[in-house]
Amino acid sequence: MNLNFSLACETQASSFYGGFRPFIKYPSLQHSPGSVKEGDNKGANRSLKKATPWLRVSLERPYKYRTTLNARPVFFNRCFDKGRFKSLILWCILNFGEQKTVELVEQLKDIGYHQATLAGVSLGIDDLKIPNSKAQLVAEAQLENQLILQEDLRGNVTSIEKFQRLIDTWHLTSETLKDNVIKAFRNTDILNPVYMMAFSGARGNVSQVRQLVGMRGLMADPQGQIINFPIQSNFREGLTLTEYVISCYGARKGVVDTALRTATSGYLTRRLVDVAQHVIVYQFDCQTTRGILLNTIKVGNTTSISLQKRLVGRVSAEDIYNSKTNTKEVSRNQEITPILAEQISQNHNQVLVRSALTCQAKHGVCQLCYGWSLAQGSLVSLGEAVGVVAAQSIGEPGTQLTMRTFHTGGVFSGDVMEQIQAPHNGIVEFQTALQGTLIRTSHGKIAFLTYTKGELTLKNTTKAQRGLNHHLSSSLTQTVVGETKIIFPSYTILYVRNGEAVKHKQFIAEYSSLVGENQSIKSSQKVNAEMTGEVFFENVFLRVESSEESEKTYRSFKFSDIWILSCVTNTLKFKSNFSLTKPGDRINTATVINQVLLKKTDEGVATQQQSKKALSLPLNTSMEVLGEANKVDFSSKKTCKGLLQTDYKNLGYFYSFQNKLTKKAKSFDHSTSHLSRKGTVSLVQKNNTKSVNELFFKYGKPNLSGGSDLFKGSTSKGSPEGATGSLPVSSLNKDPFVTWYSSLFKAKYSGFYTPSTAPFTDTRMSQPAFRLAKKTANKKPPTLPCKYWGKGSFLLRNLSEVELFSNRNPGVFKRLESMTGLLSQQVYQDCYANQKILLTPFSPNTLQHSSPNTPKGVLRDGKSVVGRSNPPQHFHGSVGGGCPSKQVSAGPKKGLRAKHSEACFAIDFGETKTKTITKGRYVSQLNCKKEKRLLAKTSRMFSTLKVEFWLFENLTLSLVTHQHFPQYSYRSVEGPPTGMLGLWLLNNSFVLKQLVTNLETVASVGLPFGVVLNQNTNQNLNGSELLSQSLLNSSKKVEGPGRSASSGVLRAGSVGVDWLYFSSANTYLGKVSSGFENNKTQLIKSGQGVKQNFDQSLISQETILLASALKQLSNKQKTWPSLAFYNTLTFKNNNELGQSQLFNTGELDNNASNKSSVFSTGKSLLCHNPVLSKICNTTTFITPFNIKDRGVAPTELQLKQENKCIATQSSFLCNPTNLTPKVFLTTNYPGKVACSCVGGDVGKDTFVKVNLSQFDFIESNQSRFVPTLSFTSTLNRVNAVQQISLTKPHIYQKFFLSAQRGSYHLKTKKTLQGSPGLSYSGISNYSVSHHRSKKAESHTLPLRLNYAVKKVSRVDEERIPLRKKPKTDITKVFSIPELDWNVKLRLPSINSPETQGKNKAGVSYLVKLDLGVQRPQTAVSGRVDIFQRGLGDSEKALGFKGVAPHSSEKLNVPVFNQTNIFGLADSDASVKAGAVFETSKYTGEILKSIESKQQRLFNTPLGVVEKGLQLQNGQTHLSQLETKTIPSSLSPDSTQISPTQRVLTSDDQKTFNVLGKKPLVKVGDFVRYGDFLTCDKKISVSEPGLVIKITSSKITIRIAKPVLVSSGGVFHVQHGDFIEENAPLVTLTYTRLKTGDIVQGIPKIEELFEARISGTLHNQLAIIFENYKQKFSSAYAARKSLERIQQIIVENVLNVYQSQGVTIADKHVEIIVRQMTSKVRILESGRSGLLRGELVTLESVENANKSIHGQKAEYAPVLVGITKAALDIDKSFISAASFQETTRILSRAAIERKTDFLRGLKENVILGQLIPAGTGFSVSFSPEDPNHSKKVVKLVNQYLFSSDNLTSSTFSHMSRSSH
């Protein structure tokens, strides 16, 4: 449209050209000079040429020319679009005023409608012309995609790179097509209606046109992820059904988006108006000297808003000089016009101008700080409501902003990367060598990233030189004859090499326009398996990362290749040790795969066929003979039906005990040993099951870690799989944990069953345990973070039990549950019954001293008592305590006992128990006669009890409880030597676990027990109370275990009670005291390592490793690490399982899946000096169990950080009734737990929730105290008796005593009496162990400390108002810790002497183990000695242990569990055990090994683990576990876990006919897609795979899928795992630039203005403030940091609008931002009278500080979002109440008696008054007048109450007076 209109005056015309120099920019239209008819042609040309998108108006002479209008017409021969109209109208306003402008606009409107009526545009379908190049572009893109998919098939690109390339390919295609569409319209038909509409400036743009005639392109799914299926059709062609469905979501989103956008934008505007409505121009000049610096805002390398634009309409805050001419360009307070702005911006990068942000006007802003009113082109007038204008200016364009927030998988190349294409064919040459590095781009291509700027020369190879460079952006290339120079910036990615020939349009390089300014975001993407099969690591580089929770993640640190080899799993209906098939056998549907003989033993007793002396074990009926089981085929895999697959291991059944019993032990069949009790051990695998044998290995072969040689030897010997040796390694990796089920309980639980124990699942033995406790979701109980490692934490003790504990008698200790502590709080009460038993051991001593009932006496006594036989009696007592009464009544036999099923005694006990059981009084009763009575009742029972105890212990480690029983049985068997060995093994295993828990107590505890036992049965009691009863001889055995405990227990403890950890402790031994500390640490370490592998099984393996490593290590605690026990923990919390549910398959499965190893925890436990911490714990207990405050146990605790103690809390739920003794494994890993439930009967309800808090568990890991001390604690418990002597007061002495004596008590004070529980003293008796260790007897004593636990005092209880039974509970907790640790310590000291070693062996880590072992007393004693030695080294540490006692009882149980864990080996090992024991340095260890070859196994410090391996028949160790099937397929456990075999079917293979050609590949080679199979290169592979067979005519491959893992990828599988289709394989991580499109539009604006806590602004402000505080005073720093954050917000907001094409003046945003940044938070009030945390305005604090002499207020700047700022009642409560939260604001204002001065607009509108803006400004406001507020009130009163509302005289009076 050309306009011809007259301007009335010539002057005006010249003003237009002169005054408006850079008037308009016409970028795209040719300008012809002749078009202006009259006037200053030069000026006109200049103004047209220099166009900028908006007008710059020079105000130097505008208004003076509004005189006459000369009617000479000016003809603009121009197409007037929207921009030109804007310029014309602005020019008209500035020169003629509003009246004339309105007339002009009216005329323009008429012309427009007139012309539109004459013309018309029709749009037909034929106008939609599709460019011819589309088909070729799409075909090229599809070809590129084929190449990408082939690369993926070959495994050359990661899934992320593949996705990125697909997306980028289509995005590029779509963009290219869009350009072609526009080009086609331009070249063919400019008047095409579609083209005219697209470029008319009306709604819509090119993207709509692209969809009509190009291709719709990529769409996003509802999550904002790009779907890599592009819509290739356009609307003209029509969409296919798939394309239609995909595009529906995007289309609907557009419609919804618009509706929501309007609402959101409206709400944003409302909030902005509310926050700024009171900002009015109040005065001319606020006299401020401050200002803000304006500069050009850039995004990347592109200018977003130029300095010139930002300067127009501002007022300079200082004189500005031209540096070249040294003349003043602008003086202070001068307005900056468009012309001045242009001059300034040419000479200056930044300019200081006045701003609303720095205005000092008290209420609004002043004219100079605000500057021009942009609508007028002149200074804003007084009284203008600039706040409302600002709010409307920002809110109005909101509807034009998008609502999108998107997260694409990386950024489109078109958005970020500028690509350079070759302008012509040529040879690339670089003039100089470039600095840089090779990188792999996001597309998986290798390219060169330059660090510096550079240039390349493209030498022409063709003659056609012209027009070449139009493909390149002109800024980057300059063409020289024959060559093109391309200059590229730094950080360019080059795709070509020097001397490479390139073709026309080939990509040479790309560079980012956003370098440096953008943060990168780390994203991750899960890759799932594309087929079901076996994971094979072809070329993997892993590093292990451990989090605070000791969770391990395996990351690749280089690009790694893994394969999924196709196969299926065949699930066996029964778990069977025997598999008739071997790997490689061909099978069909009729093949017999395995046979199982199911026997149901009506009696609890099962006999082993093999052993010469058949033992009759009184097992629960559940027991079965597992002899055959031992044959399990390792290769076979079991899958868990439930969620996860698990392998069943024979291990679980260590029944081998019996064999052990036999003297010959070796001779007995492994199978016999299999006899394990009813429970089978099952391992739960992580996702996939591992082959059974592997599992076993884990168990069996701790050697994995390093003792592989040993391992191998033993395996081959005993193991049915000759190859077991090799197996173990892999299995280690795999199995997460083992579970065994006892048949009796099958329904209820399995030995390892973690699930039930969910609560403790998390517990990690080590310090992490407390975390675990938290986790235990199941039990509602407190989720303290009990730090206590597992051991103490268990608290589970039934509440009543706890009381018992307090009783003098150790029996009271029933607390056994505490033992669970290892597990961490979760442990269940299940174990309780068992636990009780544990307690008993102490009892004996206690009994003796019972009348005194004084803790200290006990300690002291302990020494004397040590030798006592009383212990057995105690046992009895404990029994009663042990089972929660409910349990007992329920049929303890069945339930608890069942757990123990192995030992008959349990039943009897049960009865007695019941009597005792009253929970609350339990303690006291026990104490007294009751206890005695029980004793009298049945020693056997005791043994059973013992078993239970073990279970508890197991808790920590694994579900050994059941195993315990078996061990028991063995014990029963007479053959002392052999039997002893067998027992030993079991014991060891238990011990191990226990140790872990007790870490601290390690040294002393274990021994003591053993010692006590060693003399007589009585002693046995101590060791494994139950056991001892059954076999007096056994008692010696018991000793053995005790010893173990002392050995490495510490370390081991960390992991979990069940693990072999003890062995590791052994390693410690060598170190002895110093070792202690180290050990802790190391142990942990090792656990971790192991953990990864085993997850389930790991325990045993780990153990083994330990042993061997141990040996070597002896001093280096390092070896310890081998213990991988923690793996067992893998169970992780399966809260779902109830105790009763233990058996549920589902639960089991879950455990398996957790897969993470718990073990790591073990180490953490270790870390703390367990001893100290433990002891401390005890004290703590006494204190009110504040668990949280570990400090509680101050005296002792002081030592170590109490923190550990917090963990303790966890025992939460004890389940008094639930006797179910679940044994829980505790492990380091949080979340994982293994639990065994012994008593099937227990009802779920049984668990009582104990407060963890009660237990003070103070054990802190740290307590470094003397590490040795720590030992005692755990072991102590059962062993305590024996240990006592060890204790040697000194150790304790320090804190222990204090703690014990009064300290605990202190709180408890009277409670002590019964509660003392100190009965531990009995333990001290144990000190007897003396014989062996000359030094250490005294050491043993320390164990006693355990008692210290507060358990007793009722007072405490009251004090703490824990739950009703708190006291008891607490006690329990203690006990746990005590056991293991003590033992461990001791060991180290002993390690040197072999003899000692032997003894140690006897001791075996877990006292519990004792049962199994009949070992000669001597061995026991030896053990003790060892302990003592250890103690000696760290006497203090032992003291620490004091707390442990309770634990120790529990410990015993765990020991059994351990055995189970190793079960497979267990029985055999046991048998050999005697010999095997080869002593290790640690007392706990059974390094002796002399007798049996198996001994290597023993080597592992964790004797237990070794045991499994030991089985003479290698087979036994593993397979036996498997056999456990005896529970029968019907049993719950079986359903949960079934053995599986991996089978290769015909569908998993592909055969290629090679017709006799020479093959290029050999069997075992991997072939990738497209590889050649034969030398003539004619046969290539259509599917990648592994060559499994080559004949003269055929090559068979096993179909496989390669997966490339980028560095930093997280592995969810291990080598050899079985993985289901779509199961997570790896998680790939990648980084991408964080560009503006991550959060866009309104959400981004809202995020900035609301200053959300989650956003980065608060962090930025805090960082800026901290930085400034280092350079300036705090007050200055606060102001500076607010100024900085103001600039950041302003620039961010402007950028968001600019990115959407909306330009808003800075001053509007500044007014809003000023409201957000006016407050500070008071940090220190000083003498200002302000309150800490109060939000006040910066000005008010600065003013207040000026008048203060003395300490001034300290404050930090804060950001207040607009909603919060609008609710600020200090400004106006009327305005705030009308915005939101009316009632709250009005009531608060009323309470505070606020006055509203009605300064804003809203308040006045609400009250119906004249608003104080515009005309009303002069009437009502005079801010400088001090009496202003009084006048306002007067005015208001007049207005409201006078009949003659505000007369003019009032107004004039007001204005006069105010001025």
Curated annotation (Swiss-Prot):
GO cellular component: chloroplast; DNA-directed RNA polymerase complex; mitochondrion
Domain of life: Eukaryota
Cell compartments where the protein resides: Plastid, Chloroplast
Cystine residue pairs: none
Residues that bind Zn(2+): C286, C359, C366, C369
Pfam family membership, one: RNA_pol_Rpb1_4
GO MF annotation terms: DNA binding; DNA-directed RNA polymerase activity; zinc ion binding
EC annotation from Swiss-Prot or TrEMBL: 2.7.7.6
Catalytic reaction equation(s): RNA(n) + a ribonucleoside 5'-triphosphate = RNA(n+1) + diphosphate
Keyword Nucleotidyltransferase: yes
Predominant place of localization: plastid
Known cofactor(s): Zn(2+)
Cited InterPro entries: DNA-dir_RpoC2_beta_pp, DNA-dir_RpoC_beta_prime, RNA_pol_Rpb1_3_sf, RNA_pol_Rpb1_4, RNA_pol_Rpb1_5, Rpb1_funnel_sf
Example of a GO biological process term: DNA-templated transcription
Cofactor binding: number and manner: Binds 1 Zn(2+) ion per subunit.
Alphabetical UniProt keywords: Chloroplast, DNA-directed RNA polymerase, Metal-binding, Nucleotidyltransferase, Plastid, Transcription, Transferase, Zinc
Function of the protein: DNA-dependent RNA polymerase catalyzes the transcription of DNA into RNA using the four ribonucleoside triphosphates as substrates.
UniProt family annotation: Belongs to the RNA polymerase beta' chain family. RpoC2 subfamily.
Family matches, as HAMAP family: RNApol_bact_RpoC2
Subunit structure, as described in the record: In plastids the minimal PEP RNA polymerase catalytic core is composed of four subunits: alpha, beta, beta', and beta''. When a (nuclear-encoded) sigma factor is associated with the core the holoenzyme is formed, which can initiate transcription.
Protein's name in the database: DNA-directed RNA polymerase subunit beta''
